[in-house]
Amino acid sequence: MRRLAAVALGGLLLAAGAVGAFAQAPANPVITTLTIFAGAAEGLWRSRDWGGSWERVQGAQGGAAPSGAVRSIHPIGPRVYVGAERQVLVSDDFGETWIALSVPGLVLAVLPSRYPQADSTLFVGTTEGLLKSPDAGRSFDRPTLAGVPVSRLEWPGPALVVATGRGVMVSLDGGASFTGPGTGLPGGDVLAIALSAFFVADPVLFAGTVADGVFRSRDGGKTWSPAGLDGQRVGDLVWLGPFLYAATAAGVQRSEDLGHTWVTLADGLEGRPVHRLLFPLAPASGAEIFAATDQGVWRSADGGLHWQRSGLNGRFVLSLGTFPPPLPVRGKKKG
């Protein structure tokens, strides 16, 4: 998981208004927001007050709306992509109205380009393989990695790194072909990946496995070595500065030494397994964390040391997302 630069929390959500379903997003939308999305086993939920209260996202009357299990949420503001049962849903008005794009298989991950104004590429990971759209979802190429579940996607460029049912695979040609999974990584599903912020020059990545803990590669996925949490299911990884966070059945785990040692951050989590993590202010701040569990959303305001409930009690939450923060405004230098 990698995130963009953040700014101080607060302010308003401003936009020029809704745009067409496939219209190009505004060049510089201002998004400083209190909105959090949560994908549950039975649809999409939204909080407009930083997890204080939640509402079901219904869409316009008679229109499409997210339903079924929502496993992936990717807001890029005002556009929001959601991966549901057998469809990708797209909103161009911050989640108020939606259109549905049918795809084969259950959708596990959705990843648009980091530069949507210039590049309309959209990748979709499903239980049936990897789909690529050159036009923001109007059409999809024939799937690659056919028959292989693709659960997570990272695209630092030029490499496309995917977590699959066969391990971690890497493509250098936009998903046309893949290499991997490399040596040293146990067979079976990889559920999470976290990449160096400077992956082109520093190709370090971590993989969270379904039953064997965390593994680390220093060479872009060619070779792997164990990085702790042996025997544990790792559903999410977030690498933030010196800290590596893992979502596990034992709660949230954190390492300060690239996986050599780990500490458990579970005070207040009531023993709940954690499936996903969201750091809405990263990388400027790692203090605020939201955690998706099988009994709702939890929130920490101190980097995971203490947790408290943040709504959707009793609901199995599978994914979390929020709008990326705006780029900082830079003044002109005097003189």
Indicate residue ranges for each PLM-predicted region.
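Extracellular glycan-interacting surfaces
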Residues: 2-335
